[in-house]
Amino acid sequence: MSQKEAGKRILSGVQPSGKLHLGNYFGAVKQHIELQNSGECFYFIADYHSLTTVHDAKTLSQNTLDVALDYLALGLDPAKAVFFRQSDVPEVNELAWILSTVTNMGLLERAVSYKEKVDKGIDASVGLFYYPILMAADILIYRSSLVPVGKDQVQHIEMTQDIAGKFNRCFGEIFPIPGFRLDKESKVPGVDGQKMSKSYGNTIEIFAEGKPLEKRVMGIVTDSTPVESPKDPTKCNVFALYSLFASEAEKTALEQKYRSGGMGYGEAKKALLAKVNEHFSAAREKRKELASRPGEVEDILKAGARRAREEARATIRLVRRAVGMKDEPTL
């Protein structure tokens, strides 16, 4: 446990947006799950946020279940972390509305992610524009002190800090100002050599198996250097992916084979395929077991929601009192 995370309340949210791939795993998921052994962790499935891009009920429901299965299979332990659906804590929407009343339009208009998503063809909905306020509510309602994020989310954390500061100046010191921890960047090339991304269609899925996985790995783009010739591992996508899984000794051994010549890229791809299967085999089996017991997964999410709502309700009572409302709505 690092000094930075010790004693912190850590919040991490993931949008249910499809199948996990190696870029997701090494870029964020693995790091976030490991944090459960550090501070007090809250992990939520951001299904409210997902509505900005997913407008099919069956798709959203299935994607949400997939995220739960993925994270639990990859090692998220509900005994160590609070794991729940965002939509099971409706208080977050009440807080988002209250926060919106102290948030200037100019702050939202500067949101880079909104502009980028609209440029990519996503509908410029009010919900998409409002996204940073709901994200601020997600963070503040659990009184989070640390949020692990990638570079593309830093602005949203800074906006949350601004919104919390404005609220505190208006109504008193209610919210701790959250900090963030940048995810360690991992260079994860896709099968075409570009950054691995769903939008490029170049991913290797974590839970793919058998022929589909083999076809994907064996299809990684390489140069045309002959089998007998030495090769430069630093310029090879296969070696870059292999290095994410291998020990230093294993990397050194494969590097020597590259530089010595006599090894084709097909052999390197088979070594990578073996590593991928070795690394994820236990998680794949666990995911299958969990998928056969959906009631158990639902129980985990409900238990997490009960714990999360306790925190959310305590915060919203403080907020309602601070702004001049009754602690609880009159029924």
Residue spans for each PLM region:
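Conserved nucleotide- and phosphate/pyrophosphate-binding catalytic cores
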Residues: 24, 155, 161-331
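Short helix-capping/linker segments at secondary-structure and domain boundaries
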Residues: 105-109, 141-148, 246-254, 284
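Short, polar/flexible loop-turn hinges at active-site or ligand-entry regions and domain interfaces
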Residues: 56-57, 147-150, 228
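Internal, conserved structured core segments that host functional sites
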Residues: 114-163, 167, 171
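N-terminal Rossmann-like or analogous alpha/beta NTP/dinucleotide-binding catalytic cores
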Residues: 2-137, 288
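Short catalytic-loop micro-motif centered on adjacent basic/acidic residues
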Residues: 82-85, 148, 225
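A generic secondary-structure signal for well-formed alpha-helical elements
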Residues: 68, 75, 103-106, 144, ...
